[in-house]
């Protein structure tokens, strides 16, 4: 049986941390940021952690 291919879009978007949780980037960061509150802009710099419900599916797509 052939190997499962990883979903390349998921590989580019998600990273698995050492403790097993999955990191993702924040949405709404590409352009037209002048309308956003400065506090919102600074909090969006940080990466977010995926919910436990979605973790299994994302890890399957990556591996």
UniProtKB/Swiss-Prot annotation:
GO BP: any one term: translation
Recorded GO MF terms: structural constituent of ribosome
One Gene Ontology cellular component annotation held by this UniProt entry: cytosolic large ribosomal subunit
Superkingdom in the source lineage: Bacteria
Keyword line: Ribonucleoprotein, Ribosomal protein
Similarity-based family: Belongs to the bacterial ribosomal protein bL35 family.
Alphabetical list of HAMAP family matching this protein: Ribosomal_bL35
Protein name per UniProt: Large ribosomal subunit protein bL35
Gene source species: Sulfurimonas denitrificans (strain ATCC 33889 / DSM 1251)
């Amino acid at each position: 049986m052939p190997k499962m291919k990883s979903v390349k879009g998921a590989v580019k978007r998600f990273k698995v941390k050492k403790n097993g949780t999955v990191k993702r980037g924040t949405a709404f960061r590409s352009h037209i940021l002048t309308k956003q509150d400065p506090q919102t802009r600074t909090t969006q710099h940080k990466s977010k952690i995926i919910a436990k419900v979605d973790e299994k599916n994302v890890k399957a797509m990556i591996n």
